[in-house]
Regions:
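An alpha-beta-alpha
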Residues: 95-99, 103-104, 114, 206-257, ...
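Hydrophobic alpha-helical segments within soluble ligand-binding/sensing domains
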Residues: 137, 195-222, 234-235, 267-268, ...
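Short beta-strand elements in bilobed, periplasmic/extracellular small-molecule ligand-binding domains
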Residues: 119-131, 221-223, 244-264, 309
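Structural motif
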Residues: 79-81, 125-148, 255-278, 293-296
Length: 401
């Protein structure tokens, strides 16, 4: 497949997604690295702020009802519920992929899926990495616009914050689809984004919080980690806070705002601070992304917290280190994993429909909670959630490829 990266080594997205490279290392080494976390930073910066959760209400559920919902979310090999028909592959397209930050395993997982699907289509792909900064995003868009794409995928950045750049694409008649660029799946109102591909973030957050309630038998002491720069993150943290507040025996200790791009610098110190402040009252950490735990785990280990002494659950996206921690039973007990590779294929399918003058499919994948009981299935042996539902064959059949 023609593939022209604009960042060094971007043509090897597997390495970016999983620096632990499981196909080249032993499981013993992987588990040691998972305990230690990844990308350990010598510099520790204080100062992420606490934020009050917004008022979102949820009706309290019985423990039996809670457990039933959690069990349903952990089912494996769920049948395909996406599109079965659509236009054949439109020829000769070039796609620009603007990534918020390729240190985010979710974004790189989507990029891998897009790359697979583009290769199947016979199209061309270039990836522009914003590296997690506003200046980087501006530069990435400038380069993407200058490359004159036929279509653009916005991955992990808030669409409303980039609306001026997206409007330039719309004025050229360039279709835009996105991943995690808004608070819900579907078109993003007020922007040219025709389809925001994501599982339902409200349901993702609900399942994550209910997982903590079920684990603790209704007595969880919870800290929530979020990034208020992103609407989807705020939606998730507000819903999780609401679920915990609705649990009579649970305690919402704190909602902490930490920029994902700063997690490497700030999470070690924040983890130490939270341990000192709440002690054994802190039983569960809920985060809007697994990456926070990459940097919290070394601090927990250093503090002598037993691996079962604090339960970490993430409302996205199912990173390789998260799978390793769950398999090894090292702090993290769950992640509501996005089917990242499948969503990459869906993004390409949605663009193909737009190129053909057809409406988007609007498909929303069901929510899936990965835990110790199902982590080995549906792609778990490759440290990802890759549903065993035949999506690749189905899309190839639709595209006549």
């Amino acid at each position: 497949m023609p593939f022209e990266p604009v960042s060094k080594n971007i043509d090897k997205p597997t390495l970016l997604l999983n620096p632990l490279a499981p196909t080249r290392c032993s499981m013993k080494l992987l588990k040691v690295l998972a305990i230690a976390g990844i990308c350990l930073c010598a510099s520790v910066t204080q100062g992420a702020q606490s934020v009050p959760p917004a008022a979102v209400s949820h009706t309290a559920l019985s423990l039996a009802e809670t457990q039933q919902i959690v069990d349903q979310a952990t089912l494996r090999s769920v049948p395909w519920t996406g599109p079965e028909s659509g236009p054949s592959a439109q020829p000769g397209k070039y796609i620009a992929f603007v990534a918020e930050d390729l240190r985010n395993g979710g974004i790189v997982g989507v990029a891998q899926g897009v790359r697979e699907a583009v290769r199947t289509m016979g199209w061309t792909l270039r990836i522009f990495n914003a590296s997690g900064s506003s200046a980087g995003l501006t530069t990435a868009f400038e380069r993407a616009l200058a490359s004159n794409p036929d279509g653009l995928i916005l991955c992990g950045s808030d669409a409303l914050g980039s609306n001026a750049e997206l409007a330039q694409l719309a004025s050229r008649g360039v279709p835009v689809v996105a991943w995690h660029a808004g608070s819900k799946p579907g078109p993003i109102a007020g922007t040219p984004v025709a389809m925001n591909v994501t599982t339902d973030p409200v349901e993702v957050a609900r399942i994550t919080a209910l997982g903590a309630v079920a684990q603790s038998h209704g007595h969880a002491g919870v800290v929530i980690l979020t990034d208020s720069r992103f609407e989807i993150a705020t939606t998730k943290s507000n819903v999780m806070a609401s679920i915990i507040r609705a649990c009579q025996g649970c305690t919402l200790l704190e909602v902490r705002n930490v920029a994902i791009s700063d997690s490497g610098k700030k999470m070690p110190a924040i983890t130490q601070e939270l341990l000192a402040r709440y002690g054994k009252r802190w039983t569960h950490a809920l985060a809007i992304n697994d990456i926070y735990f990459d940097y919290a785990v070394p601090a927990l280990t250093k503090a002598g917290v037993p691996s079962n002494g604090l339960s970490l659950l993430s409302a996205g996206d199912g990173s390789a280190p998260a799978f390793l921690r769950i398999q090894a039973k090292i702090y993290q007990t769950g992640t509501v994993a996005e089917p990242l590779n499948q969503q990459g294929w869906q993004l390409v399918d949605e663009l193909n429909r737009l190129f053909a003058g057809r409406p988007v499919s609007g498909f929303v994948a069901p929510v899936h909670l990965v835990n110790a009981n199902n982590v080995a299935f549906d792609g778990g042996d490759r440290f990802q959630y890759d549903p065993e539902n035949g999506y690749r064959e189905i899309y190839r059949r639709i595209w006549k490829r």
